[in-house]
């Protein structure tokens, strides 16, 4: 009987992942690309349903991922060295889960093989987001959806 091989996200740390493994941890939910507000008193991070100008509101994918930093200078670029700071990511995020030594959820494409499961399970905000330019920044508090961190 062959020994069971643990998936890479169980047997490796974030620092040990190659580029392809790292990128594959992203479940495609797009939540990290939503505009966020930070409570200055307790540093809590609140997610809004307002999407970055490059985020496709249906697919939850960046419309110009390779060049995103040029068009959105404050775009978040996750790296393994930031793992200690991943508490602000959604609790369902593969990067956060692996950094905390947890397994990926059953709906994650690396587990179930279906990249659309994140939408079918309503983890993503597909179809429920607002375009960044459609909401004045002063009104973002009216569109909070959850707290992380």
UniProtKB/Swiss-Prot annotation:
Pfam family, one: CxxCxxCC
Family affiliation: Belongs to the UPF0260 family.
Protein name per its UniProtKB record: UPF0260 protein Pfl01_1392
Organism: Pseudomonas fluorescens (strain Pf0-1)
């Amino acid at each position: 009987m062959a020994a069971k091989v643990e998936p890479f996200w169980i047997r490796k740390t974030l620092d040990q992942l190659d580029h392809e493994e790292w990128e594959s941890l992203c479940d495609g939910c797009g939540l990290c690309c939503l505009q966020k507000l930070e409570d200055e008193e307790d540093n809590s991070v609140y997610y809004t349903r307002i999407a970055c100008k490059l985020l496709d509101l249906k697919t939850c994918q960046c419309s110009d991922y390779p060049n995103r930093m040029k068009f959105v200078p404050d775009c978040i670029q996750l790296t393994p060295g930031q793992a200690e700071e991943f508490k602000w990511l959604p609790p369902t995020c593969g990067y956060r889960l692996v950094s905390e030594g947890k397994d990926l959820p059953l709906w994650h494409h690396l587990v179930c093989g279906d990249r659309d499961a994140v939408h079918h399970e309503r983890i993503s905000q597909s179809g429920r987001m607002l375009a960044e330019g459609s909401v004045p920044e002063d009104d973002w508090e009216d569109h909070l959806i959850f707290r992380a961190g």
